[in-house]
Amino acid sequence: MDVRCWTFSIVAVVKAALLSVMPRCSWAASEPNVTYHDEEWGVPVHDDRGLFEFLILEGAQAGLSWTTILKKRENYRKAFDEFRPEKIARYGARDVRRLLRNEGIVRNRLKIAATITNAKSFLAVQKEFGTFDAYLWSFVGGKPIQNQRRKMTDVPARTTQSDAMSRDLLRRRFKFVGSTICYALMQATGMVNDHLVTCPRHAELAH
């Protein structure tokens, strides 16, 4: 085993030890939430395809649990061409019928139609700003907001930033982008660090 492998192993052991002593955020109590919490939630995303995926998944969650969406995530990727907006924007009636028959996703006609609409609006934003990343991150000044929450009841459902994001996305004809959904998107993509300060991931993502 070379030095890099030893280093990786030591880091993994230390991280596991920390998580055994310092509790995760309480919503991450079982899989698939645990892995998502430890590896993705709150990690800054600047890849446009990744941002589009979270935008669609957060909208799909409306009225459902995030656990439900995580369990369907791979099915969503397959059903929606790996979340490539340029392909989804060209979906027609045949694609909608195909998706409505797909038991691996949320078969809601409004949400499916919204995904197609959002793909078109997403491409328009890319054309205007160069990247969706540049547009979306402008709502937090281009860098993560480092919050210092101590308990889950301290975490808001929306903020002034998510309100502003929601208003502008709606103006650009995006669907399923209310302020609460926008704040969940901000949390997921690392625009805000909402891991509790008692969670080891908070410190890891604060740098």
Task: Give residue ranges: language-model regions.
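HhH-family (HhH-GPD) DNA N-glycosylase catalytic core used in base-excision repair
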Residues: 14-207
